[in-house]
Amino acid sequence: MEEFKGYLQKGGFKQQHFLYPLLFQEYIYGLAHDQGLNVNASTFNEPPEISGYGNKYSSLLVKRLIIRIYQQNSFLYSVNNSKQNRFVGHNKNYYYKMICEGFSIVVEIPFSLRLVSSIKETKEIMKFQNLRSIHSLFPFLEDKFSHLNSVSDIVIPYPIHLEILLQILQCWIQDVPTLHLLRLIFYDYHNRSNSITPNKSSYGFSKDNPRLYRFLYNSYVVECESIFYFLRKSSSYLRSTSFRPLLERTHFYGKMKHIGVTCCNDFQKTLWLFKDPFMHYVRYQGKCIIASKGTHLLMKKWKSYFVNLWQCHFHFWSQPSRIHINQFPHFSFYFLGYLSSVPINLSSAKSQMLENAFLIDTFTPKFETMISIIPMIGSLAKAKFCNLSGNPISKPAWAELSDSDIIDRFGRIYRNLSHYYSGSSKKQSLYRIKYILRLSCARTLARKHKSTVRAFLQRLGSEFFEEFFMEEEKVLSLILPRTYYPLHQLSREPIWYLDIIRINDLVNHFDL
């Protein structure tokens, strides 16, 4: 990043927001590939003197490539001409991918510089490093959701129109050539994809260029949430929490009180104006959760607000029927691998007044998180640890490894799952996962030694797996003093860790 800043200041590009010249810097593509590129100039049909020393990557090759991108229909040659032009075929996909990877590095520079400058301006953000953890969100839900009435689980609509994305980026990137090149890349890939598969989405390049896709998606989400931030900042009722520390909250936007919401379309027509006395907004992956203590009518207004926001501001048609308003405690929702709900717990207390005794029933809502075992078994079956019925099977791909490596892999998977699901209110499903992985490990070892599982376990003993499948509460009992928590109580209470910054692949059941 310091090298980026030095180049921008040296060339005078920082003040004018010129990013286009960075596309011709070799270190940009070295960063994109995390190594030096060895691109042969003959693949470009260029003479050796253009490629530079040692046939290494040259900025002149990128310049020639960008010129070809600007040429009309440069990627849409017929099959008959593909033999005469080496730019067509498998090479064109490589060229396109190379430009996109370098381009994704370049367009992130304004955002990265702004984040670095904001961190230097204040040290307040350093106090919230623990909020990087995914588990840091669950204590907030435990504290707040038990007092709320309504919740709505919304899928953020995507993709939006390409021109809307470009309009969003114009607020951040003021370099016209860079935006023009991005537009050409969008439509060029769109045309090439539709010429092969007409029904393919225009954002099919998410698999080919995940970094550029994530950048575009995050830009769109930031635009959505910046509207909430603007309303929150402009409201006279909101004077409590600053927005700057919330930059560190990867999956948490913040609490909003008494928000006066106004949404205007192109005709400056006010759609809604209302105040919510207690509203919470949480975003995770491709979804967001809106929870409120208000009435059902107020939630319907929020629903209409989101629909009008997507239709008027982003020109994206969103069906109102896809946004469901649910009432606690009769609703459970999937959240970061957990099945979350707010059931009503009944507790009775005996009260005695003089000679009369009374039983007082107290209904207390409590936020609970459980492991959804059916999707979890589906993930384990997809990874070839069991079948769809949950019966453990061997892992033939690991049968060539040593015994210690096989056991270490299975044990590491279970420890990671146990670590992630430590916040579950009920541990029975976690024991089921442990059973599947232990027996799958035994079947894999028995397959390797051409023996049965019973004979293998009798020869080594069941204690052979204990050190590799150590329980989470046993680990905590070694760390915490004995007087800090009783072991039986520790196994029942949810435990949230502040070192989990990504979702386990087996936990992420759904393609969002």
Curated annotation (Swiss-Prot):
Supply the name of the protein. Maturase K
GO CC field: chloroplast
Lineage top rank: taxon: Eukaryota
- What's in the keyword line of the UniProt record? Chloroplast, mRNA processing, Plastid, RNA-binding, tRNA processing
Name a Pfam family for this protein: MatK_N
PANTHER family found in the cross-reference section: MATURASE K
Xref: InterPro entries:
Domain_X, Maturase_MatK, Maturase_MatK_N
**Similarity section:** Belongs to the intron maturase 2 family. MatK subfamily.
Gene Ontology molecular function terms on file: RNA binding
Organism source for this protein?
Lemna gibba (Swollen duckweed)
Disulphide connectivity of cysteines = none
Q: Predominant location of this chain?
A: plastid
- Function, in words: Usually encoded in the trnK tRNA gene intron. Probably assists in splicing its own and other chloroplast group II introns.
Keyword match Electron transport:
no
What subcellular compartments does it reside in? Answer: Plastid, Chloroplast
Provide one Gene Ontology biological process annotation: tRNA processing
